[in-house]
Regions:
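A solvent-exposed, acidic/Ser-Thr-rich amphipathic alpha-helical stretch
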Residues: 1-41
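A beta-strand edge to alpha-helix "cap/lid" segment located at domain peripheries
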Residues: 24-118
């Protein structure tokens, strides 16, 4: 699993389930602009939402193997301020777990927020 809110690539179905399972709880809602097939073995969704009062947009590409199992997920969020917030919230939730390494700490997210506000 790759994405703009991640600081690395999370591998395996267990990681995908844990990360996506919590990520879904952060959305106030999801307004889908497009959902559909992407090539022979893919799926794409484009949606907007709000997380803790901040607007966020996302384009997600999911790839499947011949058996229909997910082999790759790439999720790209925007704008940058919302990406930093999302990664921070995920990092706080997964603190102390093996998934924490994939997200920004509170301090790192705050430092980046300050840098983009300059």
């Amino acid at each position: 699993m790759e994405g703009s809110v991640l600081t690395g690539i999370a591998q395996g179905p267990e990681a995908r389930r844990a990360i996506l399972g919590f990520a879904r709880t952060l959305y106030d809602y999801q307004e889908f602009n497009y959902v559909g097939r992407y090539g022979d073995h893919g799926f794409v969704e484009d949606y907007t939402s709000v997380v803790r009062g901040q607007p966020i947009g996302s384009v997600v590409v999911i790839r499947f193997n011949e058996a229909g199992q997910t082999t790759r997920i790439v999720a790209n969020h925007r704008p940058l301020g919302s990406v930093l917030l999302w990664s921070q919230l995920m990092g706080e939730h997964f603190a102390g777990t093996r998934y924490a390494q994939y997200f920004l700490s509170h301090d790192d997210a705050q430092a980046l927020h300050e840098a983009i506000e300059r």
